[in-house]
Amino acid sequence: MLKFSNVARRRVPVVLVAMLLGACLIRPSGALAGTSTLDGIYTGAQAERGLTIYTDHCEMCHAPNFTGNPGAPPLTGLEFLFNWDGMSMAALLDYVKTMMPPGEVGSLSDQEYVDVVATVLQANGFPAEDSAELPTDPDALAGLAFQRPK
């Protein structure tokens, strides 16, 4: 069994706290500023790209104003917000990629799907971030929460 001196025992918690605080302060270049839709997890430019894709592939069912049509649910408003509240952005993107567009599932690139999701976030009034785009990486998206405004 390892034995630690009293000095070593006192230093371990201090070192651990310092490491945790340091990890919280570090933001690698290109890292997302926030961890939820309320923090700004996409850029305005990304939403603009997504709007073009939405117009070409989505609005015929979901309407130009994102309000939906019979058989195609709204992508804005309380129903949409409550449906996804508390879910990860990975879950939302996975749903979009595996279900949309009907008859053409998987026809868009990962970046195009993410850009459309950014457009939907913008249409719901979620804030944009200045420089860090919503990522295509599923692991990164899993750490981002869809959180409705309270």
Task: List each model region and its residues.
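Short linear capping/connector segments at secondary-structure termini
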Residues: 35-36, 74-80, 136-139
